[in-house]
Amino acid sequence: MNQPDLADDPDPSPEPLCIVCGQNHSPEENHFYTYTEDVDDDLICHICLQALLDPLDTPCGHTYCTLCLTNFLVEKDFCPVDRKPVVLQHCKKSSILVNKLLNKLLVTCPFTEHCTEVLQRCDLQHHFQTSCKGASHYGLTKDRKRRSQDGCPDGCASLMATTLSPEVSAAATISLMTDEPGLDNPAYVSSVEDGEPVANSSDSGRSNRTRARPFERSTMRSRSFKKINRALSALRRTKSGSVVANHVDQGRDNSENTTVPEVFPRLFHLIPDGEITSIKINRADPSESLSIRLVGGSETPLVHIIIQHIYRDGVIARDGRLLPGDIILKVNGMDISNVPHNYAVRLLRQPCQVLRLTVLREQKFRSRSNAHVPDSYGPRDDSFHVILNKSSPEEQLGIKLVRRVDEPGVFIFNVLNGGVADRHGQLEENDRVLAINGHDLRFGSPESAAHLIQASERRVHLVVSRQVRQSSPDIFQEAGWISNGQQSPGPGERNTASKPAATCHEKVVSVWKDPSESLGMTVGGGASHREWDLPIYVISVEPGGVISRDGRIKTGDILLNVNGIELTEVSRTEAVAILKSAPSSVVLKALEVKEQEAQEDCSPAALDSNHNVTPPGDWSPSWVMWLELPQYLCNCKDVILRRNTAGSLGFCIVGGYEEYSGNKPFFIKSIVEGTPAYNDGRIRCGDILLAVNGRSTSGMIHACLARMLKELKGRITLTIASWPGTFL
């Protein structure tokens, strides 16, 4: 309790030299530079009053250093200039032109005793590494190498979003929020795209024109950061604080109470709903587990790869931005938005120190502004009318509607082969839907368009416009399938039946062993296995053991019974006891499960042959393997919900019967926070909805089940089958 407050210490211990600017400042501070000339007022940050570093534009039209604005918004929620409300995730990186102007500012080398070089700001770091005698004299290069070997990226050189303080994490994350090819003036993210640290030579620092020596700080700046540090310390001590304590605070807390668990940042808000976002995650060990579970894949109605569960001690939890239900669209630039489950898992398991993910958090219950925006996003042909006739009110049109990030309105993303729209032949991909049955959708949403289509009896009147010239690919925000949640084949794809992800067949194996000899295998699963009830399965086979010598029982086999004793509903402890007590003659009934290899094309760089096969000791069952097991092995549970005042149960379903794809199970795709399904806590993404109030969902079409769920009142019993997602 008598520990001094570091923020108030008049003589703090010197910080290590920064390899970007050559100054000794803490990771919470911007870089310091000495400029040869006065900086133009338009390139000055209105918070620190110095040249912009990593400039960030607010919606109200002002520009600040990313770190300055992030620190300011820790306590405030408005723009410092005009005091209009500002949310960090709504801010955008400044244009390439602004960044180029900043990078060309002339600065002097801070090591004036050894070097008198004058060079552009963006070249200073390279100068330190290659030709600066001062940097060598002060051990800057050695210090950088030592920090790299120690796996410590906080030497003021890199604002990595996952390893530094939460203020820097938020700042770095903003630079990754856009991934928008085709824009005339995209956000400046060259360092992110090139795979370099965010605060590299392209990311510049703050001016320090008044300082003659390289290690001095102005009194005003010190006072400013003391206030910020005190505010952050207060946040760390509150239950609602969403930031993680720094290394000094952690060490002090651990010395006082060793039982306090490690606190991870809660930075969920940095990924906005309904927008495709790119993030970068660092791992000191390239092979460190992500500690998440994944569901989904193109062979299921979920289509996308979705995070089912995040474990508290893993890389993703330490990063603090992702949530269960988030959709992973790309992995290190590789598109996995519509690939088989096992293919996506193989990509995510590739060792790498920097993992780049493009993710989508679906928009939930957010009303969109209908303010008028000029329709000037590119020339389009005159609008035309399309009338589609449904054979029944429940029939789907067979189109997928999405919204674009850079243009308002509703757009056709895909037309399902054989659907109503496809048979009519007039609608095409990228068409913009201006109106449905007289309702203006020029600034509408795909959700409202879907409601209008579903409310139509038989005749759907659409007003559509078509762009004159195809633009470069746009990024879409998904709104769900109009055609029952099932993805249609892309252009040129063959509409062939999908192969099962795994095949099963039963086998009976008899082995002999000495009375004191072990069978030589390790099993997992069992009733009440952590959070799931699972069959007993073989994790590994000991080389040279009884099972290994016989060769018929393999890793991944499901054990059904031993000498006539059923293992389908026993715990792992009970199963091990039964196996150990078996006599010399052992008869094993097992289910062999063979998973199909993903046949996707992939480059050698993306999937190195050395990493394609999981080591036997690290084998774990995949989510798609569980889906292919016979129904009698499926442990079902009843979840009782009561509809809340908003009238929503709080989950989204995909799947069901379709004329062209047959019968598919209904999967839970997403769960809305604060709803009955969320509050109950037993329903997860990827769960299968088998029955509602005792009525089986098998063979139902999507519209029928959705209507039934909306009309049910009071106590609702859902029969759920839940399997654990693939662990990474």
UniProtKB/Swiss-Prot annotation:
Residues 185-220, 481-500 are annotated as: Disordered. The modification Phosphoserine is found at residue 445. Changing residue 48 to A: Loss of function. It holds the Pfam family zf-C3HC4_3. Changing residue 188 to F: No effect on binding to NUMB protein. The keyword Electron transport does not apply. Pathway: Protein modification; protein ubiquitination. Keywords: Cytoplasm, Metal-binding, Phosphoprotein, Repeat, Transferase, Ubl conjugation pathway, Zinc, Zinc-finger. Residues 278-362, 385-467, 508-593, 638-723 form the PDZ domain. InterPro entries: PDZ, PDZ_scaffold, PDZ_sf, Znf_RING, Znf_RING/FYVE/PHD, Znf_RING_CS. It catalyses: S-ubiquitinyl-[E2 ubiquitin-conjugating enzyme]-L-cysteine + [acceptor protein]-L-lysine = [E2 ubiquitin-conjugating enzyme]-L-cysteine + N(6)-ubiquitinyl-[acceptor protein]-L-lysine. Interacts with CXADR. Interacts with MAGEB18 and MAGEF1. Interacts with the phosphotyrosine interaction domain of all isoforms of NUMB. IGSF5/JAM4 interacts with isoform 2 through the second PDZ domain, other isoforms may also interact with IGSF5/JAM4. This is E3 ubiquitin-protein ligase LNX. It comes from Mus musculus. The lineage of its organism: Eukaryota, Metazoa, Chordata, Craniata, Vertebrata. The gene is Lnx1.
